[in-house]
Regions:
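Extracellular/lumenal carbohydrate-interaction signature centered on repeated Trp-anchored short motifs
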Residues: 102-115, 190-193
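Short edge-strand/loop segments of extracellular domains
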Residues: 132-152
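Extracellular beta-strand elements of beta-rich domains used
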Residues: 42, 222, 240-244
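Short carbohydrate-recognition loop motifs
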Residues: 72-97
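Extracellular carbohydrate-recognition regions
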Residues: 23-65
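Extracellular beta-strand ligand-recognition surfaces/modules
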Residues: 137-143, 179-180, 186-189, 193-234
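Solvent-exposed strand-to-loop "edge" motifs in beta-rich extracellular domains
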Residues: 118-124, 147-149, 204, 227
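Bacterial N-terminal signal peptides
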Residues: 7-16
Length: 248
C-alpha cells in the first residue's frame, strides 16, 4: 500500500487542512436524546453514489464532486438491500474516505467513548499483512484520528486503526510512524465472512492502553480504508451505522 514517506505525508496532510475542514465540513451528525451520537448511516445518499459528506484522505476535497475519471478511482458506493443502505467497497486499489469531526466540538468521547459500527467482510486479501510495508493490505479498517502535538512546528496526529486482518489474531497491536499510529486487530481470517458484524471499541480506554495517556475530547476525523493493491487481490466489504455511545 502506501510506503512510509507517503504515510507521513498522509498524516501531515490531515493537519494541513484542518482549518478547511472546520470551515466547510458539512455532515449529518445527529445528537440523540438517548445520549447517542449518530455519525453516519448512509440512508440519505443516492444508491450508487460516493457519499458527498466524506472527503478524500487529506480532507481537502470531496471525491463525489470529482470528474468521472478521478471519481472512478474510488471503489466505494452506496448500496441498498431491502430497506437498508450502506457503503460498499469492491475492488483492489487503496483510497481512504475521511469523515471530518474537527468542527463537531459537541462530541466529547469522555461522555460517549464507545465507537460502534457494523461491517460485513466478503473477501480477505491473500497474503495481506498490516505489519509489513510491502503487503499492507486489509479487508476493512477504521481509523480514529486525534490532534495532539507538534513535531518541528508541524502538527502530526496520533491514530488508532482498527483492522480486519488476513492473518493476525484478534488483539494484535502494531506500531507505525514512530509510534504515532497504532494498528489494532479486531477481526481476522475467514470466520463469519458474508455476515454483518457489529463492533464496539471504547476509544478512551484503547487510547490510554496503547498510548499511555488521556486522549483529546474530540477526534478530528474517522477514516475508512479497504485495499488489496499490494497483494493484487479483489475484495469486497461493507460499512454502516457509525455511532458514539455512552459507556455501558
Amino acid at each position: 500500500m502506501y510506503k512510509t514517506i507517503l504515510s507521513t505525508l498522509f498524516f501531515a496532510g490531515i493537519f494541513g487542512v484542518t482549518t478547511l475542514q472546520a470551515q466547510e465540513a458539512i455532515n449529518s451528525v445527529r445528537f440523540g436524546d438517548n445520549g447517542v451520537v449518530y455519525l453516519e448511516d448512509f440512508e440519505h445518499y443516492d444508491v450508487g453514489s460516493i457519499p458527498d459528506e466524506w472527503y478524500n484522505r487529506d480532507g481537502n476535497n470531496i471525491p463525489a464532486t470529482y470528474d468521472e475519471l478521478y471519481r472512478n478511482d474510488y471503489k466505494y458506493k452506496v448500496v441498498q438491500e431491502d430497506a437498508k443502505k450502506f457503503l460498499r467497497y469492491e475492488g483492489t486499489e487503496a483510497k481512504h474516505l475521511n469523515f471530518p469531526l474537527i468542527d463537531k466540538k459537541e462530541i466529547n468521547i469522555f461522555e460517549t467513548p464507545i465507537l460502534k459500527w457494523d461491517w460485513r467482510i466478503f473477501d480477505i486479501p491473500e497474503g495481506g499483512d498490516e505489519d509489513s510495508s510491502s503487503q499492507n493490505d486489509v479487508a476493512a479498517s477504521v481509523y480514529v484520528v486525534f490532534d495532539t502535538s507538534r513535531i518541528l512546528f508541524q502538527k502530526i496526529p496520533v491514530t488508532i486503526r482498527y483492522t480486519w486482518s488476513s492473518k493476525y489474531p484478534v488483539g494484535s497491536i502494531f506500531s507505525k510512524l514512530r509510534g504515532r499510529q497504532k494498528i489494532m486487530v479486531i477481526g481476522t481470517g475467514e470466520n463469519n465472512l458474508g455476515k454483518w458484524q457489529t463492533f464496539e471499541r471504547n476509544l478512551v480506554e484503547d487510547y490510554k492502553n496503547i498510548f499511555g495517556k488521556t486522549p483529546p475530547r474530540t477526534p478530528i476525523a474517522i477514516l475508512i480504508l479497504s485495499d488489496a493493491d499490494d497483494t493484487r487481490s479483489h475484495i469486497k466489504a461493507d460499512y454502516d451505522d457509525f455511532e458514539l455511545h455512552p459507556a455501558r
